[in-house]
Structure formats: C-alpha cells, structure tokens
C-alpha cells in the first residue's frame, strides 16, 4: 500500500475562492475615458440625457439646478474642479434619489479680462484698440470666449460631470444678450433705473466703474497726513486758529469742499507750548500754534506732530464755522469758503475727530454734501486717474499709474500735494499706515472713488409692481425665505443687502451687453417706449449686441426723431449679465421650471452671483430665482496658504487626472468639508488615494465573493439570518437613513466618510474576516453561507448606488462588471429603506462582542510576539467573563469563528491571565488548539479524522467535500 503522503488529496478545488475580473489596480487614467465613451453613446445627450429620459418616463419629480457660470477665459483650475465636481454630486445624487434633474452648464463671457486679452492680441499686431472697429473687436472677443468654452467643457466632462452640455448657455449668445436687455428694460419700465452723478469705485487701470461685487480688499501702505485748515469765521478763540484733519488720500485735498464734524464730539482749541527736543528735522508745528482737535484725540495728534506740551485754550462749537482751503494762499482756484458740515459718520475713534470732505471722492462725503443742500459735485480726476487740466497746481499729475512698469502703483499726485501743503504752511505731520484698501478683483490694482455720471438701479424706491415695496425690502424678505447651506450664509448676504448702495450697472467698456436705450437730450429722461424696445430686442436676437452699436438709431426709434435722443453706449455690469441667467436658462423651458431649486457657488458669490441674481429676480419678479443656496470655500495648499503660480504651490486638476485619475479628485472633493476652505497637495492626495484603494478592495472582494450568486441561493426569510447578518443588515438600514439625509442636505462628506468607515470597520475588519471560513469552506447550500452571500448582495447593491454619485467611475465599473447587461448604475434609484432590517438589539450585542474580541486579539498578539503561535487558527482561547452581560452577548454565536480561532471556550468567572484595562470583566487564557489540522480549512480540532471517508478533514469540511464530490459525480 502506498504511503499516505503520496496519496493525500489536494482539496483546493473544493474550496470556493473569490474570483472577479474587477482588477485590484484601477488604472483610472486609462479606464475613465473608456467609461466616458460608453456614457456618451447612451443617447444624443449621453448618460445625462439617458437618465432624464428614464426619470421622465417614470413621472419623477423635477429638480432644477441652475449653474453659476464660470468665466470663459483660460484652462480650468483646482477651484473650478471643486465647484463642478460638487455640482455633479448634486446632479447624480438627485438622480439617485429619484428626481428628474435639469442642469444646464453655462459660461460668463463678457467683461474686462477677455477685452484685455484681445487688446494684447491687437497690440502684438501693431494695432491700438482705438484703431480697431468696435464690431471687429467684439467679434474677436466672441471668438476668444467661444474657444475657451469648448476647452473648459472638455475638461469638465473629463471629470465625469453630467449636464446638458449639448444645450449649454453663454451670456454672449444672441438670445442671451436679448434676454438680458429685456430684463434691463423691465427696470427701466418700473422706474427703478436712474442716472446719477456720484462718486463710484473707479479703476483707472481698467478705465471703468466697478460695483461692490467687483471689489476685493488687500493690505496696502498709504501716506497719511494731518492738514491744517485756517478758520476764517467762528468764535473769537477759533478765528485765527487752524482746524486739523487727517487723511490717507492726500491726492483728494484739491477736491476738498468741506470739513465734517459730529455735534456730539467735544472739540477744543489747543495751543502748542513746546516741541520735542533732539529731533533730526524741524517739525512743522510751532510754539504758539493754535489748533482745533477733538479732545479725545489731541494727544495722538500732538504725538504725531512731535509736540511735547500744549494747553487747552477753550472748547469750541463747530456749527457755523467757516474755513479756508489749505492751498488758498498758493492759487486763487482754492479761494472758496470751506463750510463745516454736521454728520453722524464722524467719530473720535481715530484721526482728529474731523473728516476732510471731498464729495466727488467718497460715499459719506457725497451724502453729507447733499444732505446740507449742496448739489454741485466737482470733477477733479479724469478716467485715466490724472487731474483734469482745470485743477490748479496739479493739472495732469497721475493719481494712479495706468501704463508702463508702474501700472497699478500710486503716481506723483500724493507727493505733489504734500509738497504744496508744506509750501503753504498747512501740513502739520505725515506718516505711513498699513490698512485694508479696495482693489479691482480683475486687475488687482487699487481703485479710487471718482465722481462720474453712471446708471443705477434704486434700492429704496417704492415700486408698484412690487406691491409698493422697495427692492431692498423685497430682497431682504427673499433672503429670509431661502434655505442656506451653511445657514450662516443667510446672515452674510443679508447684512450686505441691508446696507448696500444703489446698484451701479453701467460700465464704460466695449465687450458686453449694452444698456440698450435712448435718453431725451433735453429732459435727460430715458425713453420707455414698448415699440422701440421691441425693435431693439428683435435686432439683438437676430444679430447679437453688435446690432445696437452698428445699426442706425432710426432703425429702433421709429416715429421718434433721432436728433432728439442720445443712444447710450455703456455696457451692463457683468454681474447684471450673470444675474439674468435664470431668465434665459430655466424660465420658460418645457423641461425646466422657475425658480430653481438650487444655486451652488463659492462663498464669495454672496456679494457676486447670488446677490445679483437675487436683486434681478426680486426687481423683476418679486422673489429670488432660487429656493436654496449652497456655498463652498476656497482651495488652499497643504499648509493652508493661498495658491499662486509665483509661489509654486498650485496643483492642476489636469495633472491629477492624467497621473491618478479624476476619481481621486472626486473622492478628495467628497471627503473634505467643502463649506470651509480646503487644503490639497501631493501628501493629501496620497491619503485620498489610500482611502480609494481600500474602497476599491472592498468592491473587489464583494464582486469575488458574490461570483455565481443567484436568486435560488438568496435567503428571503429575515428570521433565518444568523445574528451577524442581522447586524450587517441593521447597519445598512442605519446607513440608508444617514446617506439619504446627507445627500438631501448636500453634506457629501457625511456620505463618504461613514461608508468608508463601514467598509474598513464593519466589513473588512469584522464581517469579511469572520465569515471568510464559511464562504470558502461551507457547502454551497449551507444556510450560514447562503445568508452571508445574500447579505453581501445587499451590501453591494447599496454601496454601488450610495457611492455612485461620488465615486462615479469606480461604481460604474463595479456595477457593470457584475451586471453587464443592466445598464449604467446611474439608471438606478435608491431602493426604499427596509425598516424590517432595523435591529437595535443586534447592534447592542455586536458592540459588546467587539469589545470582548479586542481582548482576545490582544492576548493572541502576545502569543504571536512570543512565537508560541503563528496564526490565530493555532489557538483555542478560554475566555473568562466576570461580566454576565458580555457573556450573554455570545449566546447562539460560534465564538471560535468570531475570534477567528480554531475554537474557543467561554466560561463564567475571572480566572484568565490576559486582561485589557479598557474592557472590564473579561480575561483570556490564550491556549493552543488541540487536535489535528484540517487539510482543507486549516482549523485545528479534535474531530479531524473522525470521518473515515476524509481522514484529513473536520466533520464540517468532510460534509462539504462529500457534497462537492456528489455534485461532480
């Protein structure tokens, strides 16, 4: 008879081993384009169109998601990627929740950045902008924007972003421009539009007015001066003294027309008695000088002026006081009287307690000037940021440089004004101060307040079509009626709207939508003739905004005399453009609806698109064009620093997609708290990639473990499920509620993070590990194995649909690997939550079981470290329970299976050698397993060899092999 060693059977063929074509290595950069190609082939509008068709056929409720338009200029950056991926999460999750989602991507096309680019292109060809016909210039702008729309669209689609790309909108489309003008005409018709000469934020570099939304603040170092105004009328103590003002804009002194004071602030005449000694320069203050300053600020002023001591002469009342301009002695141009004006904007927190008032260069200055009955606003600075020729002493000097290497820097005006003040004997002191200063958000150059005629929309004008309410009142109520995510957004935009000035909507540029209207040359009133407006709109629909600039006025005016009217050639604020997108994208379309269910953009859009859309909607329709607003933060580098090419800390989405795949970028977006600023970099992406691998491995295991699963194998009676399966089903029930609620509230990290934890904890560390032996070695018809595979089927089913909106490429790959004929995973709707799966008792039980398991695992680790055992299957621990509640948790369980050992014994008492401080009432004796090693399952049991048919196997394995042999025979 042959030796047993030569005849021992190889049982590997009788063991089930997970098998799947789903690869461990994702190869995302190669795989994703293949998936995109498959999606594109599903319908004329790709996967997006195919899903909409299915939802509409099923009568699904409509969800309208309106896209905030990115600017059509340049390749997308990481901020664009974050924004569009978040939007894709919304689209796909709403599809998964059973909605028919309307999402039309769009682009903002007008404005200065493109205009600058085209100017550069013409300069490179030796042509100045003023030498290029406006029609040709605008045509080049349109072509430039169109090219970037196509480029960005391709990049967004590569990220897996779904939408109606085939009907994308653009603010430069002829129909869009016509609709924008139509919306503008509504403000004209309701009396909300007016022309005003007032100081506005002006960018000399860009040569145009800017709205609040186009301003950003940066730290800036400015000169600061204390200036003396001689008192020519007032009390005896005041006349002959000099009143002191403080300003950080010396260049505005030639525009001074008044000084403001606050009647509630005490002021006095102070006399200089001594100067500081040992100075390297001679102070401009002199002993005997009498100066008028707010009492609270006198010490600060004298310190700046290097005055060592002073005395109070007497208190003064500023009402009725008249001053001379500090430059009056140098030129008669400044020989006018300078009145004192009471104003509550004046404080004694800093400065001198007085405010130098130049009504053409400040909002408060302008308001207080008008409030006191003055109407004439002086023009001091021209559109290029230089003094007009009529400004004595300073004609032609630049306030701000607009050309050459110093573009965006303050020019010689400040220095020249200070020198003349010294010459006049009216500069008391000067210094420098770092403060927050307004800059253009496009050019990044400082801006100035400048008086100029502009067109405005009134915020506080009662409008009949708004039930007699003002635009501000309607907008404030609309904010209260809107849902904000996070909720703090309501207060942020609310504070802005409550205090904002009238909406400045005119710009003095070429590339944009025109304020297409005529103004009566005699009355200054805009022409509001419906027939004229209809002709204007028809022309723009046919030929775009160019028609307004190229066609004769008579084409529009009809019976009106062209000689009587001025055609307005200003263009609209680009924020007005984008604020109208709801009117030509969602309103009036058969497969959409107004208002939108959702707007989603960066938090800076509280003062941008959210606000312009709000004001446009409220001004024309009496409500916001959205029901809810979601905001996200900004992308920073790994150290929390702002990204910039000069710092070399940028990371491009194209690079991530090429090297790692768009899925990694999508997963990073899902995992961050997007409502705050997010950090991204190589180290962070490496962590994201690691999380992705674990997620992919979970899906791969599920696919392999479910190989061959069919409905005959399914366990349909919940009561037949073992305790562990009931716990896993409970976790699915629990996660179902969390996932739905998180998606409904746009909290995507609250979807991905619990699911990753579920995969790594409940599944990989517990469920897969505990049931591995059953999956591999139980006979196929064994109830426990069938229950396991049934539960895995439910897990796979839920994970794929829950994760599909986020990890879209991988869930598509996993789903179609298992069900190649079922269509894309995006076709699916989340199955209803199965309340029968809720089992709080099993959840409580397995929390206790896991505590006990941690003690057993700790004991076995010691045994491995001491090399007394190799694997856990070599152990048969005895677990002692002083805590009866913990012992009761194991009722009906196979403790050896739970501990991943060959067997285990549970006893009441407290005699075990190994303990863990964190788990009271449990101790373990990590005994070695006794018996023989099963040649199939490798468990060491006394029963191995007791079945004569299979002497190398345990009884369970012998039965399984017999079943297998019978099936093969």
Swiss-Prot record:
A motif ('HIGH' region) lies at residues 70-80. GO terms for molecular function: aminoacyl-tRNA deacylase activity; ATP binding; isoleucine-tRNA ligase activity; tRNA binding. GO terms for biological process: isoleucyl-tRNA aminoacylation. Catalyzes the attachment of isoleucine to tRNA(Ile). As IleRS can inadvertently accommodate and process structurally similar amino acids such as valine, to avoid such errors it has two additional distinct tRNA(Ile)-dependent editing activities. One activity is designated as 'pretransfer' editing and involves the hydrolysis of activated Val-AMP. The other activity is designated 'posttransfer' editing and involves deacylation of mischarged Val-tRNA(Ile). Belongs to the class-I aminoacyl-tRNA synthetase family. IleS type 1 subfamily. Monomer. This is Isoleucine--tRNA ligase. It comes from Caulobacter vibrioides (strain ATCC 19089 / CIP 103742 / CB 15) (Caulobacter crescentus). The gene is ileS.
